[in-house]
């Protein structure tokens, strides 16, 4: 009975040894942040100051070579090879070197106990007992993997995966026969016989003949110095990404590297036009995962500005704010077919000076639809839409729906928001655009997987902690119908444009800040959202680089890269809640609206109670013989007089000035007392 109890206690002791070994083993592995494809982004050194990237499984042919070299009878012994042990003792007794008597299990015990340099008899006995515990607690395959992950290979490298990456620049599974032999040759003398040493080559050639004489050994090409911090981790560091234990990020390092190369190539070409920096963000809208985050063209560069993550730097966002203004307008009764008078207006602003908003090209286009206005990124109609929505209402939309936190008081922006003065960082702006492929909802951004806590300073700055509704889906569909229309915007962007990509159903919006300091494009499909910023870290102006010609060039390449990747599944965005309505049947003009719309009610909400649509009060015209100035009413037929003389009746008549000078134009309603008076000037032609 006593012997049975002793044996049971012995087994329990061995089991406890195995349990302790599991903890020791985990403590010897590096804390690693992986990308979404299990590529290491950042590897922290362990308690021994070694870089230890673990493998879960070993390639079968590598396992065979490892066992041939280190422990041919590994599958058959219980931690100790008695034949090798007796042979080693005999050799010591006769004064010869003991040779390699340790099994793989014993070597693993030595690594776990940290007794590699202290080869006393007591330690060897302790390692032997520990080996029995390991064999009892773990399977043979588990022990082999643990050994492969704890061997030291020189240069702070622990484990064959770390050694393979550092010496050959590839994971172990991708190494060839010669590279694997070179790694195995490092064992026993890791500091003097690693692959960067010539002694490794000499030994490896002999070892290959010993282990696999039929194979041809070719001296492998080694890398220079390997970094255990991928360049894609630069942006994660700036976000404060940390993991107490090994974790997985949402980042795709391979995609990030390709995008960074696109950005670097663009800057190399466009440096002459003043563009030295840029940033790109790629999101999965359905999961709100950050797939790629590029805030520098070269984070390893010492050039000023390259150490700044520009994806997190707030800059004026230009016209990229417009879809959100129109979204609120549609929610308050406007429609893509609503008319607005694109002309000069005067607005008082906080500075005390009047604001006379102009379009990008300096022209006014008269009466246009909101569809035309958004497609062509017209400023004045956007401002009129914001005026209709109301500044307090739009501030509330930004605050309450998007949880946006401006860097200045809204009172400092006012109607300047419609002209692109609002500052925002690219990551936040791209996140906000995800409401369109998400059909009106927003969710917290994610850069870490598997319920790891997201970094505290991950934009937006506050309060998006769960899925929230930003807008009704029907209004989202109306905005998308405009943003996805590539034909209506031809006037501003042309038929051949960087905004044209290899996908079908996608939306896009450009932006250019005042005096060309910032170039923006944000666009999306149902599968991803891509935001691009181009500018300079010191905020100097670009040389006539617009959103389309700057950020648009990068956006075009990145979108096509994604369209031709597994990320693109051609997810279509629905239009089931909106419909094409016959706006002016006599002209066969249709536009998007809601099925129950009363067209006449929504059509004129932005029009002032004016009779004359064109010309505008104060317009200037050059005088040419036989030139005609069209007089156009908003809707009803008018009786027209110029300087007291009748020139005709109807919704549109022509007036031919006879000389330069001032002209008073009167439009009199035919069926009421309403009339409108404007003045224009006809000036001599410029020479």
Protein language model features and the residues they cover:
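N-terminal type II signal-anchor transmembrane helix
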Residues: 1-36
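A short, well-structured edge-of-sheet supersecondary motif
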Residues: 30-42, 58, 273-303, 396-399, ...
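Conserved catalytic neighborhood of penicillin-recognizing serine enzymes
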Residues: 91-118, 226-239, 334-394, 442, ...
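Active-site SXXK
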Residues: 64-67, 71, 259, 288, ...
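Soluble, non-transmembrane domains of envelope/secretory-pathway proteins that act on or interact
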Residues: 34, 213-232, 348, 460-465, ...
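Short, well-structured active-site flanking segments
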Residues: 75-84, 158-161, 304, 330-350, ...
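A penicillin-recognizing enzyme superfamily signal
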Residues: 249-272, 280, 284, 293, ...
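Non-catalytic, structured segments within soluble enzyme domains
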Residues: 97, 101-257, 261, 404-405, ...
């Amino acid at each position: 009975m006593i012997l049975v109890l002793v044996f049971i206690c012995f087994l329990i002791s061995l089991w406890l040894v195995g349990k302790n070994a599991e903890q020791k083993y985990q403590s010897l592995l590096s804390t690693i942040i992986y990308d979404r494809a299990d590529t290491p982004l950042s590897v922290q050194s362990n308690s021994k100051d070694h870089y230890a990237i673990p493998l879960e499984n070993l390639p079968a042919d590598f396992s065979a070579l490892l066992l041939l070299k280190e422990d041919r009878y590994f599958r058959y012994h219980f931690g100790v090879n008695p034949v090798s042990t007796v042979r080693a003792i005999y050799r010591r007794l006769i004064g010869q070197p003991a040779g390699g008597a340790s099994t793989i299990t014993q070597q693993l015990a030595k690594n776990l106990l940290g007794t590699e340099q202290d080869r006393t008899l007591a330690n060897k006995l302790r390692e032997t007992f520990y080996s029995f515990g390991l064999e009892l607690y773990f399977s043979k395959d588990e022990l082999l993997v643990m050994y492969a992950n704890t061997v030291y290979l020189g240069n702070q490298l622990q484990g064959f995966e770390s050694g393979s990456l550092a010496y050959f620049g590839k994971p172990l599974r991708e190494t060839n026969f010669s590279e694997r032999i070179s790694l195995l040759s490092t064992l026993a003398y890791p500091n003097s016989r690693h692959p960067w040493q010539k002694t490794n080559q000499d030994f490896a050639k002999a070892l290959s003949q010993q282990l696999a004489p039929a194979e041809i050994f070719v001296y492998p090409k080694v890398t220079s110095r390997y970094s255990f911090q991928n360049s894609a981790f630069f942006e994660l560091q700036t976000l404060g990404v940390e993991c107490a234990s090994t974790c997985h990020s949402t980042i795709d390092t391979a995609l990030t590297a390709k995008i960074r190369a696109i950005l670097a190539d663009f800057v190399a070409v466009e440096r002459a036009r003043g563009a030295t920096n840029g940033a790109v963000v790629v999101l999965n809208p359905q999961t709100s995962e950050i797939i790629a985050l590029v805030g520098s063209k070269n984070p390893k560069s010492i050039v000023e500005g390259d150490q700044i993550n520009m994806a997190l730097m707030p800059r004026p966002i230009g016209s990229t704010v417009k879809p959100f203004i129109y979204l609120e307008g549609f929610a308050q009764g406007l429609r893509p077919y609503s008319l607005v008078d694109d002309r000069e207006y005067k607005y008082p602003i906080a500075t005390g000076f009047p604001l006379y908003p102009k379009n990008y090209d300096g022209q006014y286009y008269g009466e246009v639809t909101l569809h035309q206005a958004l497609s062509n990124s017209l400023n004045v109609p956007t401002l009129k839409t914001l005026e209709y929505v109301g500044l307090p209402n739009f501030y509330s939309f930004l605050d309450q729906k998007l949880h946006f936190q401006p860097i200045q008081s809204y009172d400092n922006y006012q109607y300047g928001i419609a002209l692109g003065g609002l500052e925002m960082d690219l990551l936040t702006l791209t996140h906000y655009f995800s409401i369109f492929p998400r059909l009106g909802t927003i969710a917290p951004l994610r850069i870490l997987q598997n319920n790891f806590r997201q970094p505290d300073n991950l934009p937006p700055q506050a309060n998006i902690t769960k899925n929230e509704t930003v807008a009704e889906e029907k209004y989202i569909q109306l905005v998308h119908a405009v943003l996805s229309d590539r034909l209506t915007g031809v006037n501003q962007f042309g038929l051949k444009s960087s905004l044209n990509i290899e996908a079908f159903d996608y939306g896009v919006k450009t932006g250019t800040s005042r005096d060309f300091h910032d170039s923006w494009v944000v666009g999306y499909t149902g599968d991803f959202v891509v935001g691009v910023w181009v500018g300079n870290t010191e905020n100097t102006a670009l040389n006539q680089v617009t959103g389309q010609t700057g950020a648009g060039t990068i956006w075009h390449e990145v979108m096509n890269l994604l369209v031709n990747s597994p990320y693109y599944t051609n997810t279509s965005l629905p239009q089931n809640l909106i419909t094409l309505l016959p706006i002016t049947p006599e002209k066969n003009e249709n536009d998007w609206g809601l099925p129950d719309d009363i067209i006449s009610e929504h059509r004129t909400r932005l029009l002032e109670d004016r009779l004359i649509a064109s010309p505008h009060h104060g317009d200037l015209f050059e005088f040419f013989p036989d030139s005609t100035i069209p007089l156009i009413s908003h809707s009803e037929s008018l009786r027209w007089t110029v300087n007291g003389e009748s020139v005709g009746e109807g919704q549109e008549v022509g007036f031919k000035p006879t000389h330069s000078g001032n002209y008073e134009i009167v439009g009199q309603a035919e069926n009421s007392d309403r009339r409108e008076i404007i003045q224009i000037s006809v000036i001599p032609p410029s020479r």
